[in-house]
């Protein structure tokens, strides 16, 4: 088992990474020395079938536990589901010394974390991520639910007390989910580590990724995020760099309809557009043709669907939480590992987006 310590202004907490470590859940949580009068275990219906009862039984050996499974998919990050979980917490008589346990991917982590951040003005929670994608979202304390007009518009900063990342869970993921998670790994490499990106560029297919490579990806990805979050917990500065590819990515997700495209596929499109703008504005020397061919080979979409208008995407970006005073904030690269924040008027991004989409149609 490997471990990392996340250091932020508000809290220091451990991340445990290893195969099969969920089976030591009770011991790992006990080592945190939290009061934990009761536990509310929140998972989703698919994860529940594989790991829900196992973790429930392990935790129940030491604490009173209630398990709730929400529907799988981005649609669960809704106000209705948030209120349902608050009701479950109240009816189970959670108190300020209770703890919420999130077992699942990024959706469950975001939702359960937001419930924890707001119940009785904030109680403890612990993350048990089960997907490659959630190596990113489980660390850093950003928790949220969606609004019909945009992704993650209703949320808070609320750090977990620990993250228990059992890499054994990744072995059961379908290729689509592996690809989605890999996009966030690629993002971390682009913004911070050229040698890591060069390693990733050697991947020929999702199926060829070994267990050892997965563990190393998770460790490196979390290490990069930990470094950024330790310097900027509340996204006042460099933490915004972690949004590379996400401005267009979130717009695509919202416009397609949540669940119609994976987060990672949308972010892959967003990164390709960000590289295009980086080339035009900053003369970024990244070989976009090589990157596009590699991403296509791994199964990522090449372009935004033609039936989705540029105007609709701009509207979504204008509602993005990073937009300030009608000015769209974009994360660009002047080279791999060197990030710049740039502000654009909507008409500028519309022009770049139309150019990029025309390039993709050739």
Swiss-Prot record:
Example of a GO cellular component annotation carried by this entry: cytoplasm
Which positions bind Zn(2+)?
Answer: 184, 246, 263
> Which coarse location class describes where this protein primarily resides?
cytoplasm
**Pfam families per record:** DHQ_synthase, DHQS_C
CDD domains tied to this protein: DHQS
Q: Matching SUPFAM superfamilies, A to Z?
A: Dehydroquinate synthase-like (SSF56796)
Q: Which GO terms describe its molecular function?
A: 3-dehydroquinate synthase activity; metal ion binding; nucleotide binding
Q: How is the cofactor bound?
A: Binds 1 divalent metal cation per subunit. Can use either Co(2+) or Zn(2+).
* InterPro entries hit by this protein: Dehydroquinate_synthase, DHQ_synth_AroB, DHQ_synth_fam, DHQS/DOIS_N, DHQS_C
Q: Which UniProt keywords apply?
A: Amino-acid biosynthesis, Aromatic amino acid biosynthesis, Cobalt, Cytoplasm, Lyase, Metal-binding, NAD, Nucleotide-binding, Zinc
Q: Which reaction does it catalyse?
A: 7-phospho-2-dehydro-3-deoxy-D-arabino-heptonate = 3-dehydroquinate + phosphate
Names of the cofactor(s): Co(2+); Zn(2+); NAD(+)
Q: What is its EC number?
A: 4.2.3.4
* Pathway of action: Metabolic intermediate biosynthesis; chorismate biosynthesis; chorismate from D-erythrose 4-phosphate and phosphoenolpyruvate: step 2/7
Q: Where does NAD(+) bind?
A: 72-77, 106-110, 130-131, 142, 151, 169-172
Family membership: Belongs to the sugar phosphate cyclases superfamily. Dehydroquinate synthase family.
What job does this protein perform? Answer: Catalyzes the conversion of 3-deoxy-D-arabino-heptulosonate 7-phosphate (DAHP) to dehydroquinate (DHQ).
Report what the protein is called: 3-dehydroquinate synthase
